[in-house]
Amino acid sequence: MILPWLILIPFVGGLLCWIAERFDKTLPRWIALASMVLLFVLSLWLWATGNYQLAPAPSSGIVWALEFKQPWIERFGISLHLGLDGLSLLMILLTGLLGVLSVFCSWKEIQNHVGFFHLNLLWILGGVVGVFLAIDLFLFFFFWEMMLVPMYFLIALWGHSGSTGKSRITAATKFFIFTQASGLIMLLAILGLVFVNYQSSGVLTFDYADLLKAKLPEGIDYLLMLGFFVAFAVKMPVVPVHSWLPDAHAQAPTAGSVDLAGILLKTAAYGLMRFALPLFPESSAQFAPIAMTLGLIGIFYGAFVAFAQTDMKRLIAYSSVSHMGFVLIGIYAGTQQALQGAVILMMAH
């Protein structure tokens, strides 16, 4: 039962911040800080009391250290299905830590609409935690989209003009268009996977464990894998679909930049590890050379362009493109050590 609370804490905390602004402008800051500290402490407690592994062996089936399942839209086989293992817990620990830091970063910087700012900040973090816990694909998509709208408001309302002179509205709109387009591709891939599985098994379900057993025709399998890859590649971001990141990073408030580079990019890498590779193992193996080539291009392109930047935030954005290239290569290298290295780099970046 603790898993829903990991998601509810940021959402409830955000609502309380919005309400509390009417009484005292400093109160939302303290509520946001308390919410993030509570999330981080709960994550540490789970880490200390559990026995976790990064991922089970392929032959052993799925083993969740903690699991929560509640019917939601039964007609379409959609449930509130949450699962926690070592990989998702590491990401939630990182989210809690950077959540605390992002509240501190915004303490003096944000002076207008403090309550609404912290509502958006905490709802981004709540959506991220939901992404890391969801093992129903519709629920995963729901949280994936939910964390994007507050990020748009964060950039559009509290951002500032970067060194290139582009406005915060332009950067926010570019971010929104790129991420919504990738979200649409992901939705089509999820619906395609569910439909093909329904045709072969007669069971309509969005559950991760059931879809892992889906028997997919070779061409369809590759096409659906590409849909997932493109959706995650935009968010990661992978060259050449990276152009939204430098603008969004430069124009975002400091707390937004912390969340963007520190957490949001990792949701895409997590999605590749959790969904793209296990759901489409053979197609992913065929596609691996292309993915690793894109990662290699990203490493050098991001590093060289970072050298030319005079704005610190844009420099960090391009270095993020470079670092996520290493993560992409690690994910598609096909060895346990490479995956562990990718996770370590995701934590360290």
Could you say what each language-model-derived stretch is?
Residues 23-25, 119, 123, 127-216, ...:
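Alpha-helical multi-pass transmembrane bundles of energy-transducing inner-membrane proteins
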Residues 4-19, 34-46, 92-106, 124-125, ...:
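Central hydrophobic cores of alpha-helical transmembrane segments in multi-pass inner-membrane proteins
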Residues 19-23, 27, 51-52, 108, ...:
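Membrane-interface elements of multi-pass transporters and channels
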Residues 1-2, 16-119, 205, 209-213:
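Transmembrane helix-loop-helix hairpins at membrane boundaries of multipass inner-membrane proteins
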